Amino acid sequence: MKIRPVILCGGAGTRLWPNTKKHQAKQFIDFGNWTLLGKTLERVKASIFDAPIISTNAKYLRQVKQHLKKHKIRKFKIVLEPAKRNTAPAILSTALIEDIPNEQPLMFLAADHLIEKVGLFNKAIKKNQKKLTHNNIFIFGIKPTMPSSEFGYFLTKNIKVTKFIEKPKQA
């Protein structure tokens, strides 16, 4: 079964100052001929993925639809977040969509991450896709070296996630 990518695209995306503005989050900034959301949409065109779900808010809806059209993604679902409440509620609201089969794996991706080695990205997904069951979750990313108020992160024990820390406050 193909993985259903869920692109989290509702955040303010302000950590690329001075390029970000109130009306334009970093996932929508035009870097000449590409945007971070555009790169994310291109990544999920790989054969291992099903039609994407984009979790966003009403403020970004027009820009999301423009990107879907530009990248020729015709089959998709958009989930509008009722209020901006961080990552976990966006994941939960998307995971509760009724027409997603229970056995279909979901992969949550940030709209504003730059992944340059797409081949390695897809290889890591394929390798771990075989290990997925309805009882587990596969996550991967850059291992944090210290707590940061810029990023949320997972705590693990014996390859199991024990807790998610949402962008901790600076000490």
PLM regions with names:
Residues F28, I78-V79, I137-I139:
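Conserved beta-strand scaffold positions in the cores of enzyme catalytic domains, especially
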Residues A25, N33-W34, L61, F121-K126:
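Amphipathic alpha-helical segments in well-structured domains
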Residues V118-A171:
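Conserved core of the sugar-phosphate nucleotidyltransferase
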Residues M1-I7, R15-P18, W34-F108, L114-E116, ...:
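Conserved N-terminal catalytic core of the sugar/cofactor nucleotidyltransferase
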Residues K2-I3, A25, E103, S148-F151:
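A structure-centric signal for secondary-structure junctions around beta-strands
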Residues G11:
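Active-site beta-to-alpha loop of glycosyltransferases that engages the nucleotide-sugar donor
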Residues T14-I29:
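Conserved N-terminal glycine-rich FAD pyrophosphate-binding loop of Rossmann-like flavoproteins
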